Amino acid sequence: MPVIMQSQLERYVDEIKKIYGNHLKAVILYGSYSRGDFRADSDVDIMILVDLTDMELKRYRHQLSEMTYDFNEEYDLDVKPIAKSNEHFQKWVSAYPFYKNVKKEGVLLYGAA
């Protein structure tokens, strides 16, 4: 991953911390950037794991969307975050192919997954 991208991802994680605070458990980069086969037009796939219920997560949806939009505009990126309950992710990681893939190829940017 290019050094400039690493710096931008660190800033994005800092913004995620501001939104979720102590509820944030992990931020995982997955997809083409984690595998190293990205192109100039690749999106940046981010999994956010939090210590919140699905209902509680909904309260943060707009804030995450607004922050991500502003971040993408500022850095000319296409960050695509998915926020999930850490409990849900851990429960289903061995059963859901998508979660398995995130766990297998993911690069931990913050916390522990």
Regions found by a protein language model. Name each.
Residues 25-33:
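Short gly/ser-rich loop at a beta-strand->alpha-helix junction or flexible surface loop bordering the NTP-binding
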Residues 1-23, 35-40, 51-113:
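Catalytic core of pol beta-like nucleotidyltransferases
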